[in-house]
């Protein structure tokens, strides 16, 4: 599995995936605010929406194929592009402040040739649509927390 994200996942506390962390930061930011990004933001990743992961896993379970396959998106983006996508979904202009922090590998992507060939599976949701669904869910969670008096502090960097 390659960088699975979406609603119902961890979205605060330091254990969240980059899409949820960025959506949270953008949600708390005012228009034209700045959020912190580790490194130069040019490190690349691919992110797969949870519904697509479930469909691929279901196909794998229902098949007679035995062997490892990659389940992920082949849509490679930089962390800077991920921030820009979340800002676009939110209708905000967000600036990025690049700071020192762990970067991980410079780039990572999924090769889906085998699962495409053996199971006929391919992802279809764009990153922007997945970010839209995740951002909207996080906004609802923030609103719910505010109503219950449990405001999550917008801390941390990505």
Tell what function each PLM region has.
Residues 28-158:
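C-terminal substrate-binding subdomain of Rossmann-fold SDR/epimerase-dehydratase oxidoreductases
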Residues 19, 23, 54-57:
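A general structural signal for well-ordered alpha-helical packing
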Residues 1, 21-31:
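Active-site Tyr-X1-5-Lys
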Residues 1-20, 44:
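Flexible, glycine-rich beta-alpha linker
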């Amino acid at each position: 599995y390659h960088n699975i994200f979406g609603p119902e996942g961890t979205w605060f506390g330091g254990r969240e995936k980059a899409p949820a962390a960025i959506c949270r930061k953008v949600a708390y930011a005012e228009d034209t605010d700045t959020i912190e990004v580790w490194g130069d933001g040019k490190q690349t990743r691919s992110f797969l929406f949870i519904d697509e992961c479930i469909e691929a896993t279901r196909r794998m379970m229902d098949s007679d194929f035995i062997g490892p396959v990659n389940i992920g998106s082949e849509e490679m983006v930089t962390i800077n592009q991920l921030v820009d996508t979340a800002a676009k979904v939110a209708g905000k202009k967000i600036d990025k402040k690049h700071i020192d922090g762990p970067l991980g590998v410079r780039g990572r992507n999924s090769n889906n040739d085998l699962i495409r060939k053996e199971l006929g599976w391919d992802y279809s949701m764009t990153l922007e649509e997945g970010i839209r669904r995740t951002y909207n869910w996080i906004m609802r969670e923030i609103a719910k927390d505010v109503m219950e008096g449990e405001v999550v502090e917008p801390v941390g960097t990505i």
